Every structure is written in C-alpha cells, then in structure tokens.
C-alpha cells in the first residue's frame, strides 16, 4: 500500500508548456516548408538559422517575415500573404514532424511533473491542423490533458487568453499554474495572466537574448523545470535571468 505521507504534492497544479522551441525542435521542418514555398514563388532561399528567428507568432507571421526579408523582397499585402500561406501550409503538411526532434530532458520532465501530481497542457501559436499531428508523430500526445492551439482562442500569445483558457480547461487558478516557454511571447502572456513563467535557453525567441525577458527563472530543460517546481526556485540547476529574477539557491 502507498504511504499517503509519501504521495508527492505539486508545487503547481498545472503546467502549461509551449511547443516549438520548448518541447520540440521544429525548425528543420518549418525551414523546409518555408524554402519550398519560396522556391515555388521563384524567390531566393533563406538560411535555416534566419528562419528560426521568424518562429513564435504563428505560421502567418512566419510567412510574412519570409516574404518581407530583404533578400526576398516580395510584397506583404493581405492577398499575397494569404496566397503564400496556402503554399506554405501545403508544403508543411508534407514534412510536419519528419525532422522535428524532442529536446533532451522533455520526457523525463513530463514524467516528473506527473509524479508531482500536476496536470499538463500544450499552449502553442501553431494551428491545430499542424499541432495535433505533430504531437502524435513525436509521441507526446498522451502526456497532455489539454492542447490549446493558435486557432483555439480569438487571440494568440502574447495575449494571455490562451494560457487562461488552458487554466480554465484544467480547472486550475492562474496563480497555481506554471508556464514554460522559450520566447518573449510566452513571457508576456504569462505575466499578463498572472502565471509564474520559466524559460528554456535553447529555443528561438526571434533572435533575442532570453536573459532580457521578464520571467521567474531560466532552466536548462523541462526536467530542470520540474526540479525547479518541486523546490519552488531553490534548485541549483537554474540560471539567473535578470537582476530581479528568482534564481536557484537565492
């Protein structure tokens, strides 16, 4: 029989995790689709590292950034963007999940959060038509109780609505939730929602320094985030984010 005194208690009742750049490295597939789109539009190809800086605000923004890159120089009027987005979506459907990789520590971290008694949600700006197949192909689907996509709510991150919607679906007050992401969009959304937020340093963040974000800590991975949550900021594995950021051992 399990000793009730040894049943783990979650420091946070719900953990809301970003997808691209946090759970999965999806840049290889996104870049392949973006460059296939540009090729079909008879435009120059862009380096993978540059396309990575366009990720974070949804696929429409990614397409618009590709079109308006100085090396491409295509117009970004609504009709052109809509047509290019249709081309991108067709190519992305063909490659979605083929080269994407689960980051180290993700599975261990999800298991640790579960062991703590937390419920889990994905909160992403990626459309549902790409998110759900990607989660299945990567083997992550069964870990999550709720999936909030870029078209689930009226507004995307950095608006707080997707995070608040996830909390509502999980029956968890925002102040008892933890958000984990890799970008300014995650940080702004969590702050506006009143949710504790951690960031991983290996993601995309539109080319910006993760240390400049208003967050509660930087962790090396989802496994490190679970350690952070278990000790509420006293695990020595996290990095300092800013002078007023909670750091491990502080």
Tell where the protein language model's regions lie, with residue ranges.
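Short helix-capping segments at alpha-helix termini
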Residues: 39-44, 71-76, 115-116, 139-143, ...
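Short, acidic loop-to-helix structural element flanking the phosphoryl-transfer center
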Residues: 10-13, 90-122, 128-132, 160
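A metal-dependent, Asp-based hydrolase signature
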Residues: 57-94, 104-107, 112
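Residues in soluble alpha-helical coiled-coils and helical-bundle/repeat scaffolds
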Residues: 25, 46, 72-75, 93, ...
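Asp-based, Mg2+/Mn2+-dependent phosphohydrolase catalytic module
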Residues: 2-15, 49, 128, 132-250
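Active-site neighborhood of HAD-like aspartate-dependent phosphohydrolases
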Residues: 2-53
